[in-house]
Amino acid sequence: MTAQNLYNKDFYGWIYHNIELIRLGQWEAIDKTLLIEELESMAKRDKHELISHLIILIAYLLKWQFQLKQLSQTWIEFEGKSWKRSIDEQRKQIQRQLNMSPSLKSYLLQAVAESYEDAVALASKEIQLSITLFPPHCPYAIEQLFDEDFYPTPDDK
């Protein structure tokens, strides 16, 4: 079976076939083109995962800042505990990902900028506030995003 056929019919087998070729030093037999494509795809997946976690984290921080006070006044028992758990979980997931792939840290500022528009859209939809009420750029510093004690001061909006 050719490398292309193995790739199309048994991806897992193709991976281990190429791993074995690398171990044996059979560099000419390695399916370089598809291997490069897969490695690039893995890098993109890691960036996409980071952005996904940032979207949720920033959206919940925005919800906390822009609606916690209003909901707490409407429902006396509302303390935002589920929001806090979501914020904590996203921080943990992002930290885990950065620990596993430290080179992603160099992409963090760009990832926050790329995530912000989607985070605003998510927060806006969930708490039914106009997108125009949110800041045009992420109002949180990188340090604040990962500070386990940071929860933005609720606005009066």
Question: Which residues does each PLM region occupy?
Answer:
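Surface/interface-facing alpha-helical segments and adjacent flexible terminal/loop regions used
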Residues: M1-K157
